[in-house]
């Protein structure tokens, strides 16, 4: 019996689990893992993680003091919750976990640096070496400059929401540890813009990551490339050989259950030599960003989506804290999330409205029709996500 695609992929690419579901991580045994507000929101609705949420909230309330507002408590609890899930994940995986800086700080270099130092400090209190943590930051110019400072302090960074070569070059010149170009979201933009369907080998997201990978290898940059946000296993197959790929449990399951040859597509030995080097400064970055409508739109949309996911999670934590305090709980979390994301009130959440993490959208979209209904949501953040995560 031949090897499945997942086994073959692991021969030349580090596989990272794009999930906050600890049981899914145990199932697929990735080296690294990643979390963010929408993943934590989904996991926090699942009964098996309620104890983590409750204990984190109560501890934050205790430490915030009697005069703290509920919003102050919840903000403290969110950072602690991100670290709590990260600590659980680090008990399972041998490598690193990515923990995200508040997306609302994406255009504030100093605030991003301060938040990153705080998160690393929280992990240090639990005895975790900072080498096992990647601080996830949006790839704005300000975020990249924050990462440059943090890397000089030995705090490793994962620059996310990366859609253009200009962002990738700026990250490499800042000597960041890792970047996460978003394959599927690039494809989404081009499909919507052109009305075309793309085969995997001509997928604009695949081509973007290939260009970035070749540029890095051609000029000897040490920054690792981790392809993210996949729509199908065809994209993953075309990027076999990329340094790392972060893959949802659903697609990991498909790879594990598919046999056939998986040739290496990205390889330092076959990188073209006729690539022009670009010196990146802020003026060049801003010019290239303005000239790339896809990167401009998707970066802004991604920050807005991650911000909304954070606000929804904070609201759910507020509601949960009221329950723990014995106050009346007015609405179920899934209902709250549905109304928060159904921006036009038509009774459906599209991928554009969701704008948060793709893995959660895909898990909730149980019939895979590209939209989430209220019924799917209520089935939802526990049952549907669990079903898709563990398979």
Curated annotation (Swiss-Prot):
Residues 1-329 are annotated as: Transaldolase. Its EC number is 2.2.1.2. It comes from the Bacteria. Pathway: Carbohydrate degradation; pentose phosphate pathway; D-glyceraldehyde 3-phosphate and beta-D-fructose 6-phosphate from D-ribose 5-phosphate and D-xylulose 5-phosphate (non-oxidative stage): step 2/3. InterPro entries: Aldolase_TIM (IPR013785), EF-hand-dom_pair (IPR011992), EF_Hand_1_Ca_BS (IPR018247), EF_hand_dom (IPR002048), TAL/FSA (IPR001585), Transaldolase_1 (IPR004730), Transaldolase_AS (IPR018225). The active site is at residue 136. One of its GO terms (biological process) is pentose-phosphate shunt. This is Transaldolase.
